[in-house]
């Protein structure tokens, strides 16, 4: 496997400032190389909160777990790294709270969405059109169907739907048609460069090619890993896991994810006034959460200049109120 490195963590100062406020359990649901987790642990130490705190790191990529173990070695006694999907966050946290972390409250949860630079830069993973490699795109390489399975077996209508829904690609139908034509005329689509060539054959303008390639690869990655389904579950389970005054921060990198986060957070923070047209003096149920950030936070110019990945990042933060409130099925 080619040598690659994990990206600089995005918006670290904002994560620490808006998330780390008191002692307790902190959950990094998208561990990656451990950059955000390291910043959280250092902030807890510097604020004198280390003794009553613990960090749980979750990632489904075994390579990420191994890298994070090295990054967080100096905090080994106060960390637990779990290989799993962040959609399982509630089960992972509750299991640890019943045993090792009994009596501790969940003070903060961080979700940094999207694919890491390490995965993009590792050609064997097939995440990038800029590198020649197999069309894999699985976050955990040994599980589930790959991108190659999708582009070589799905019907034209199914491919177009994936490209439009998950990539918002305007030429989704034409690209899907070109993929099927390639399969009929030339056989199996074998790697990232075959797929890139197909997209370029449909989109002739160079600037538009780059955008369409990004959208198509994004759409396939989302489909392969059921990223939106996982995000929906993670938002619900994360919110349900928070203790009173606990906060959840979510960082997204494209509009589809950000809309999901924005909508769900607003739903959690809204009082239930019952059916429309029924006048009530008080809500049927008061919201158990409050929006900490009314608008998405973005990276500063200095960070964007140093780290291009920060350019598209948006962070939203929500907090559970002091009184107890359950997240019901209707909240999702």
From Swiss-Prot:
Instruction: Give GO terms: molecular function aspect only.
Output: rRNA (cytosine-N4-)-methyltransferase activity
What does this protein's UniProt record list under function?
A: Specifically methylates the N4 position of cytidine in position 1402 (C1402) of 16S rRNA.
Q: Name one Pfam family in it.
A: Methyltransf_5
Corresponding gene? rsmH
Q: Which domain of life is it from?
A: Bacteria
Q: This protein is called what?
A: Ribosomal RNA small subunit methyltransferase H
**NCBIfam families (UniProt xref):** 16S rRNA (cytosine(1402)-N(4))-methyltransferase RsmH (TIGR00006)
Q: Does the keyword rRNA processing apply?
A: yes
The entry's S-adenosyl-L-methionine-binding residues are 34-36, 59, 86, 112, 119
Location in the cell reads: Cytoplasm
Q: Which reaction equation describes what this protein catalyses?
A: cytidine(1402) in 16S rRNA + S-adenosyl-L-methionine = N(4)-methylcytidine(1402) in 16S rRNA + S-adenosyl-L-homocysteine + H(+)
Judged by the first EC level, this protein's enzyme class is transferase
């Amino acid at each position: 496997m080619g040598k690659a490195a994990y990206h600089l963590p995005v918006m670290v100062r904002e994560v620490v400032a808006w998330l780390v406020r008191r002692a307790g359990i902190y959950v990094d649901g998208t561990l990656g190389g451990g950059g955000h987790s390291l910043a959280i642990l250092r902030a807890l130490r510097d604020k004198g909160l280390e003794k009553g705190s613990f960090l749980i790191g979750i990632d489904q990529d075994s390579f990420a777990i191994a890298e994070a173990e090295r990054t967080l070695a100096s905090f080994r006694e106060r960390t637990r790294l779990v290989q799993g999907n962040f959609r399982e966050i509630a089960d992972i946290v509750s299991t640890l709270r019943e045993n090792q972390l009994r009596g501790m409250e969940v003070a903060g949860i961080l979700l940094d969405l999207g694919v890491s630079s390490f995965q993009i830069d590792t050609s064997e993973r097939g995440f990038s059109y800029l590198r020649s490699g197999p069309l894999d795109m699985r976050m955990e390489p040994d599980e589930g169907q790959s991108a190659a399975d999708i582009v070589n077996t799905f019907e034209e209508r199914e491919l177009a739907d994936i490209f439009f829904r998950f990539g918002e690609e305007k030429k989704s139908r034409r690209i899907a048609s070109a993929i099927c034509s390639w399969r009929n005329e030339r056989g199996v689509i074998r790697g990232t460069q075959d797929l890139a060539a197909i997209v370029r054959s449909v989109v002739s303008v160079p600037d538009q090619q780059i955008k369409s390639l990004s959208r198509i690869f994004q759409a396939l990655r989302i489909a392969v890993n059921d990223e939106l389904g996982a995000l929906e579950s993670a938002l619900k389970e994360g919110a349900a896991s928070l203790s009173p005054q606990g906060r959840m921060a979510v960082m997204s990198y494209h509009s589809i994810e950000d809309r999901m986060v924005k909508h769900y957070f607003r739903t959690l923070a809204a009082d239930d006034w019952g059916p429309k047209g029924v006048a009530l003096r008080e809500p049927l149920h008061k919201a158990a959460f409050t929006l900490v950030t009314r608008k998405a936070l973005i990276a500063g110019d200095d960070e964007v200049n140093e780290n291009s990945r920060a350019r598209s990042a948006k962070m939203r933060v929500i907090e559970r109120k002091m009184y107890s409130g359950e997240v019901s099925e209707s909240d999702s």
